[in-house]
Amino acid sequence: GFNCSRNQEVAKKYAHLSAKLGFASHKASDGDKLGALLEAIVKLQRTLECPMTLTEFGVDKATSEPKLNLMADRALEDMCYRFNPYPANHDDLIGLYKKIL
């Protein structure tokens, strides 16, 4: 989600990818295709036993919450950020971090 909910062009690309990979019918709605892709990603994460949150990864929530502003600042400075399909702002990143803690 995050990028798909903010950029329709990106959502269409992910929907197309979902159908190409066989997670959804080409005739399904883009919303259904995106849902199927997300389900497949979550299933893969669980199969590989990947942490679903930063807390599960071993990041202490109580220690991290006071550092959310710094984490967002650093993310905005990261070279990879400029390739993100949606130009998230500082508040967007804080919200994302809160969701995955």
Give each language-model segment a name.
Residues 1-3:
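Glycine-rich, small/polar surface segments that engage phosphate groups of diverse ligands
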Residues 11-101:
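C-terminal charged capping/lid subdomain of soluble metabolic enzymes
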